[in-house]
Amino acid sequence: MRFTVRSIYLLVLISTSLWGKSVQYTLSMSEPHTHLFEVEMRLDGARGTEVVALPVWTPGSYLVREYARNVQDISARSEDDTVLKIKKIDKNHWQVKGKGRQDIIVSYRVYAYEHSVRTSYLNADHALVVPASVLMYWQKNQQRNHQLHINMPENWSEITTALEPFNKPGNVDFIAKDYDELVDSPLELSNQHVVNFEVLGKPHVMALYGASNYDDSVLVSDFTKIIEAETKIFGSLPYDHYSFIFHVEEGRGGLEHANSSVNFIRRWSFNDEKRYKSLLSLVSHEFFHTWNVKRIVPKGVA
């Protein structure tokens, strides 16, 4: 039996998360038309008083966003369903008074109706999850494995993300080695058009939400050229797989992540030469950040 580096990495992550301590999330959207995500966060191995928090910014966009303003209806309980006291101690931190040596479950909702590459968005048709704006962190345990289970509406079938899946079949469970990896991995949930292709021996996926006149073969050909050209500059691809997430609607903009990018493009960008070149420029720019900024950083930031 052959084991790749990636398969060994997954085995280590999954085994430690199943048998060791982890932070576990269930992300639901039972009424997506209300624009409210429902989150349940389990603090495995909590002891006494704990603190959870929501970031104020997201990887790739280094401005204060104040995501905590969208948090609603937060509560906490112990694993035996005892209600626990939880209070907000500053603008984005909450303190939970635990019950001895019992896991703590924190539940809350997040309003998500700001459509941009740096904010989460939910409606009856699809969801863009920017994890930093939805998934809180356990203040003292950000280095643990983080597991994410997703409950989607029954009529949605696709999840596109750079996170590693586990517990197949279904692919609604994902794992990150730590909180940093989790928040650097946005997710698109819907019935988006998905195209899989391979470049330089690595799998890539292109997910497009929104109808337009794009041609899969043309996009794959041009994206392949971009990937190959930029790889020549840096020497090799620094990831095992990569996801391009596109919202094909209005506006233009992108945000880089370690193994993915989120891009907003105009609906009719594909048969107009000027607009199509603008699209390719955006893709090239965001993909360049796979190395520059995401892997090559100032010494004080590393």
Region annotations inferred by a language model:
Residues R2-L13:
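Sec-dependent signal peptide recognition
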Residues F37-A68, S133-P153:
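Surface-exposed beta-strand/loop patches in extracellular or lumenal glycoproteins
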